[in-house]
Swiss-Prot record:
Entry-linked CDD domains: NAD_bind_Shikimate_DH (cd01065)
Biological process per Gene Ontology, one example term: shikimate metabolic process
One Gene Ontology term, aspect cellular component: cytosol
Pathways per UniProt: Metabolic intermediate biosynthesis; chorismate biosynthesis; chorismate from D-erythrose 4-phosphate and phosphoenolpyruvate: step 4/7
Annotated gene: aroE
Enzyme active site: K66 (proton acceptor)
GO molecular function, one term: NADP binding
Biological role stated in the UniProt entry: Involved in the biosynthesis of the chorismate, which leads to the biosynthesis of aromatic amino acids. Catalyzes the reversible NADPH linked reduction of 3-dehydroshikimate (DHSA) to yield shikimate (SA).
This protein's name: Shikimate dehydrogenase (NADP(+))
Catalytic reaction(s) noted: shikimate + NADP(+) = 3-dehydroshikimate + NADPH + H(+)
Enzyme class at the top of the EC tree: oxidoreductase
Record keyword NADP present: yes
Pfam family, one: SDH_C
Amino acid sequence: MLRRFAVIGNPIAHSLSPVIHQMFAQQTQIELIYEKILGDDVKFEQQISDFFIQYGNGLNVTLPYKKRAYELAKIRTQRCALAGVANTLWMEENQLHADNTDGIGLIRDLSRFLELKDKKILILGAGGAARGIIFPLLEAKPLKLIVANRTLEKAEELKRQFPQINVTSFAELPEFFDLIINATSASLSDQVIALPEEAFSHKPFCYDLAYNQKTSTAFVQYARNGGCEAVDGLGMLVEQAAEAFFIWNKVMPSTQKILEHLRSF
């Protein structure tokens, strides 16, 4: 029986999710269609309702609707509740369920490059993207997890929810890290957060949650210019998609060849 999925966001034309899920479908021999839905700021909640009334099986949610999707759900997973935003929706026993697969997607992609246990990790930014990855990063048992933000007040809000983290401003960063994660939206507008030179002195591995399939993101290029190994978030996109696919279809697809295929363009 043909299963129906979609991703909703605004903008949405650039989304790689349909390509990724179709490759998962071919690999697992599951018949499905996966569409793009342009979100309507006024009618978003109605769009969600209509999708499931019309026998939709699962829905991915991207910017700027993750918070509204979270609030719409009746049942949320623990990691979704901690993130405060949702990117994966489905109906079960006539109730809307929500999960957030971004964090586990990040951890699985990072594991290709380095071990997180006992590492000193810096997250740039204290918005929704940062909030969604803190819990899974803490589960990996780093030595220290520091969140830096332009305004300290926003970082302090995160510390109230996650007392284990340290917070600082961009201007007062400690001297070295093993891993720097860019969770700001700067790369989306081709800008970078200028960091003190000392931040790169230990040659940390650098990771941008944003991705650009055709060229390096601004942060990745900035980090490489500082002598660091750096990658964008395309791998995270594929891994979070695999987790959503598993939630909906109870089959975990393989991701490595799909990521290699997407990187080859």
